[in-house]
């Protein structure tokens, strides 16, 4: 994948950054694409770096993801909760599966969606081959993860656990407005504020 380079003029001459490093200077992390261990490690490292830079200043996590590996997503989620710096989440495009869970896990009052973004929650997917006893062990594990993910969505959204369990039995798609009513986000933003306010 080709990553654009940004060139800035400084008092000491020119300085070039890849676009993601330049965004990081403004405390913006971009999570685009499927979530796996590699992506999770990069996002976690950026969260920890920005926390060390200024633990009181907002971090802005932009999400455009179809979801991915549950344990990788949970590693990002737990880090968001662990650090002191408030994490604002913004859905651009889509936040599905683990992407939706991360979107809901932003600082309350600072969870956003752009106008035409789509949000989707569902139960975790899994496939395992092997001996019958191993398949049974993995089935039990995925059921435990399903229960925990539903509890987190219920806690973050304010919905009853029973409703979340029913809604996640199948793919449950939402517009920004529907996600706001559900409690996954707090507001829809059509334009970035010109001064002050959230990003």
UniProtKB/Swiss-Prot annotation:
GO terms for cellular component: cytoplasm; endopeptidase Clp complex. It is found in: Cytoplasm. It catalyses: Hydrolysis of proteins to small peptides in the presence of ATP and magnesium. alpha-casein is the usual test substrate. In the absence of ATP, only oligopeptides shorter than five residues are hydrolyzed (such as succinyl-Leu-Tyr-|-NHMec, and Leu-Tyr-Leu-|-Tyr-Trp, in which cleavage of the -Tyr-|-Leu- and -Tyr-|-Trp bonds also occurs). SUPFAM superfamilies: ClpP/crotonase. GO terms for molecular function: ATP-dependent peptidase activity; ATPase binding; serine-type endopeptidase activity. CDD domains: S14_ClpP_2 (cd07017). It is an enzyme of class 3 (hydrolase). The keyword Manganese does not apply. One of its GO terms (biological process) is protein quality control for misfolded or incompletely synthesized proteins. Its EC number is 3.4.21.92. InterPro entries: ClpP, ClpP/crotonase-like_dom_sf, ClpP/TepA, ClpP_Ser_AS. Keywords: Cytoplasm, Hydrolase, Protease, Serine protease. The active site is at residues 97, 122. Coiled coil: none annotated. Fourteen ClpP subunits assemble into 2 heptameric rings which stack back to back to give a disk-like structure with a central cavity, resembling the structure of eukaryotic proteasomes. Cleaves peptides in various proteins in a process that requires ATP hydrolysis. Has a chymotrypsin-like activity. Plays a major role in the degradation of misfolded proteins. Belongs to the peptidase S14 family. This is ATP-dependent Clp protease proteolytic subunit. It comes from Geobacter metallireducens (strain ATCC 53774 / DSM 7210 / GS-15). The gene is clpP.
């Amino acid at each position: 994948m080709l990553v654009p380079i940004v060139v800035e003029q400084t008092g000491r001459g020119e300085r070039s950054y890849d676009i993601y490093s330049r965004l990081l200077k403004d405390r913006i992390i971009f999570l685009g694409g499927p979530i796996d261990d590699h992506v999770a490690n990069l996002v976690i490292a950026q969260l920890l770096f920005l926390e060390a830079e200024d633990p009181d200043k907002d971090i802005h996590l932009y999400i455009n993801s179809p979801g991915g590996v549950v344990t990788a997503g949970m590693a990002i989620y737990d880090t968001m909760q662990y650090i002191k710096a408030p994490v604002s989440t913004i859905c651009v495009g889509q936040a599905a599966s683990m992407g939706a869970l991360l979107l809901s896990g932003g600082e309350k009052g600072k969870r956003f969606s752009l106008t035409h973004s789509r949000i989707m929650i569902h139960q975790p997917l899994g496939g395992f081959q092997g001996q019958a006893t191993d398949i049974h062990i993995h089935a039990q594990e995925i059921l435990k993860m399903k229960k925990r993910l539903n509890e987190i969505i219920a806690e973050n959204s304010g919905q009853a656990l029973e409703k979340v369990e029913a809604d996640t039995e199948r793919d449950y798609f939402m517009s920004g407005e529907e996600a706001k009513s559900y409690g996954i986000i707090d507001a829809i933003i059509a334009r970035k504020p010109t001064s002050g306010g959230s990003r």
